[in-house]
């Protein structure tokens, strides 16, 4: 398949130019599928990065990690300070499992390691049309999110945050692709 060919060509170039094949992988524009993630594992990459913001922690998917962009659009000092002082939210059992969604709007759900964080949690979803209105349902450690409209074609991002009892911001980010 095309992705496999691209990886093999890239690996040959890395080997020729650098003398080794990197163990880190970054998905162009963060767009991937569960099938491509499995392919990345077969090629023995240790971790892979999407293109969504967030904080890495013990529950993070090691093959769809957030990466924090610093550039002219997203490089303000306050944003950098926030990102470097925040901690992961402890999300597990996230659905939809596939970053490339096949149901629109997607049913979004996840659980938190610490159910005390559920009550103050807020989530924001953005696509090319702007912020998507949503309803958030909270059940013990489980969070379910229902969108009031379909996501637009292309990349959409979700960020969930909560301030914990010590005043530290907890953050989880995810990118969807349609």
Model-derived features: positions:
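Alpha-helical scaffold elements lining the catalytic groove of polysaccharide deacetylases
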Residues: 1-18, 81-84
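Soluble non-cytosolic domains of exported or imported proteins
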Residues: 4, 30-31
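Weak global preference for isoleucine
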Residues: 7-9, 13, 21, 36-40, ...
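His/Asp/Glu-enriched short active-site or ligand-binding loop at hydrolase and phosphoryl-transfer sites
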Residues: 13-23, 31-76, 86
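Terminal accessory/targeting
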Residues: 70-178
């Amino acid at each position: 398949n095309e992705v496999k060919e691209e990886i093999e060509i890239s690996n040959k170039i890395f080997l020729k130019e650098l003398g080794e094949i990197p163990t880190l992988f970054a998905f162009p524009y963060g767009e991937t599928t569960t099938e491509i993630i499995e392919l990345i594992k077969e090629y023995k990459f240790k971790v892979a990065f999407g293109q969504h913001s967030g904080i890495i922690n013990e529950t993070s998917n090691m093959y769809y990690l957030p990466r924090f962009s610093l550039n002219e659009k997203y490089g303000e000092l306050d944003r950098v300070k926030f990102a470097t002082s925040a901690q992961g939210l402890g999300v597990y059992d996230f659905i939809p499992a596939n970053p490339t969604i096949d149901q629109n709007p997607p049913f979004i759900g996840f659980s938190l390691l610490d159910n005390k964080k559920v009550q103050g949690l807020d989530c924001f979803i953005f696509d090319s049309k702007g912020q998507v209105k949503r309803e958030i349902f909270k059940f013990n450690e489980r969070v379910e999110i229902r969108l009031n409209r379909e996501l637009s074609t292309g990349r959409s991002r979700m960020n969930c945050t909560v301030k914990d009892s010590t005043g530290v911001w907890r953050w989880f980010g995810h990118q969807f692709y349609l």
